[in-house]
Curated annotation (Swiss-Prot):
A zinc finger (C3H1-type) spans 45-73, 90-118, 136-164, 289-317, 335-363. The lineage of its organism: Eukaryota, Viridiplantae, Streptophyta, Embryophyta, Tracheophyta. Keywords: DNA-binding, Metal-binding, Nucleus, Repeat, Zinc, Zinc-finger. This is Zinc finger CCCH domain-containing protein 32. One of its GO terms (cellular component) is nucleus.
Amino acid sequence: MYARNPPLNGSQSAQAPDWTPADADTGLQESMWRLGLGSDSYPERPGAPDCAYYMRTGVCGYGNRCRYNHPRDRASVEATVRATGQYPERFGEPPCQFYLKTGTCKFGASCKFHHPKNAGGSMSHVPLNIYGYPVREGDNECSYYLKTGQCKFGITCKFHHPQPAGTTVPPPPASAPQFYPSVQSLMPDQYGGPSSSLRVARTLLPGSYMQGAYGPMLLTPGVVPIPGWSPYSAPVSPALSPGAQHAVGATSLYGVTQLTSTTPSLPGVYPSLSSPTGVIQKEQAFPERPGEPECQYYLKTGDCKFGTSCKFHHPRDRVPPRANCVLSPIGLPLRPGVQRCTFYVQNGFCKFGSTCKFDHPMGTIRYNPSASSLADAPVAPYPVSSLLGALAAAPSSSSTELIAGGAKDAYMTGVPTSRSTSNISAGLIFSQSGGSIPFSELQLSSQSSLPLTGSRITRQGREIRRSF
């Protein structure tokens, strides 16, 4: 049932085990061998590439049979590689791809691949896009970059990273543009004596909101050399005020004629906009890929954020027409005669923004054509004081009433009086912040009701009476 071991005779039991204890000096010899102090040494082959395993660990399993070079001072060799940027050339081995792209290798002398001298750093000749990623025309596009706009591999990525849609890289200018004309040196008789600085008026810049010339510019002697100048010269008179500068006109300040508002502006520095402010017309050609699914965002809006790198089809004949509609102050299109956006009416905003095809009214205005004061009323937040002044200037034949809703904390009512008065009543609703009421909450209507002479404003428990 159970296997029995054969009996052992006395001769077999008396035999000693066939092994010898380890020598006490074995550990010391191993340490000396690792340090290269023993009799065994690795072959030095100056013409052959360095042994990668030996350079990394200091030992080599092949010993004298290894066909690579084993320099005695490994630290000096690695320091030389780091300083000179020379990496091992291993003919017959595959080339190091990272070295071919970047010109560097993080493994250094211990890399087991081939590093040709004249082939490293080819990445430096590859053009980069505006985000710093390589542009490789003809290669496959980086899918991660097309989705997120970023690439974790950076400059070492081997795929194509196209420029963003609508982005053009202008060529570098041949020379820096001259924003201000050069000023020539003045002779002592032209400025009437030494001064610590020279005053030169700046030219007008196109599109500025100032009608007069800009303030004078102070030029130090380092910019305009003046013979006989000394830092310890007579004090300079204080700068003229803006009103005094307009009064001076074209008179001479320190021998230099001040430029007036009639001076022609500098061409080419600030180009004027032919289109209205806030309206940007962008012409972009999107790729047509027959056989691919159609870009739904392009079909709805006529635009595509991926541009030429989009992988979907962009049919030109199905582009929605872009109507040149006017945008409201909050950036939503005003389309009179079109159905109102129900989402905007209920929530006060629209998730489609300027691409929405419905109307987003800011308020309705009904007025008598004879009342010219309301003809040019802007669709924007309107100050209460200015609104009262405009209403007061209107003729008495067309009384105007402002009807507002939505506020519950304050209101204003009028008390009717005789017909002989020519005052105008206004029902104003103040918001919590006070000061202005957006036209989206006001409705103007023309009526022939009795004029009002008094008003009462109730706000946060305080009552104020005014008489017009």
